[in-house]
Amino acid sequence: MDSRTGEPITVPQAENGVYIWEITNPLYFKIISVEDPLYTNTRIYHLQIRFNHNLRRALDLHKAFLNFQVWTTSTTASGRTYLNRFKYLVMLYLEQLGVICINNVIRAVRFATDRSYITHVLENHSIKYKFY
């Protein structure tokens, strides 16, 4: 859903893409926080994927923040280590597809989190399209 207007995102908007080799560094990966709940063997990573300015311009986006909360049983990996692994898998999937769009990034995250040590993935996105 468009965060600014409240209207649902249409299929052509979600599937509108650009070739990945046309834009350098199309995505910015950021780790917001890492939680270690008491008395459990889980670790919660709060990750954010931001679209680059050139990618946003090509897709007619004003703002695109994809927020993920990844619940994992792997407590040995630090936040930076997991972020590097996550980024590598997402970019690997997108480079194999060759086209980057909102839906393909979400599919790439599903590919990256389809591992035995990941129990849950929660999504919360902030996407705004340009009016003009």
Swiss-Prot record:
Protein name: Replication enhancer protein
Gene Ontology biological process terms, A to Z: rolling circle single-stranded viral DNA replication
The keyword Cytoplasm belongs to this UniProt entry's keyword annotation: no
UniProt function note: Increases viral DNA accumulation. Enhances infectivity and symptom expression.
Keyword Transferase found: no
Keywords: Host-virus interaction
Stretch forming the signal peptide: none
Family: Belongs to the geminiviridae replication enhancer protein family.
Highest taxon above the source species: Viruses
InterPro entries: Gemini_AL3
Subunit structure: Homooligomer. Interacts with the replication-associated protein (REP). Interacts with host proliferating cell nuclear antigen (PCNA). Interacts with host retinoblastoma-related protein 1 (RBR1), and may thereby deregulate the host cell cycle. Oligomerization and interaction with PCNA are necessary for optimal replication enhancement.
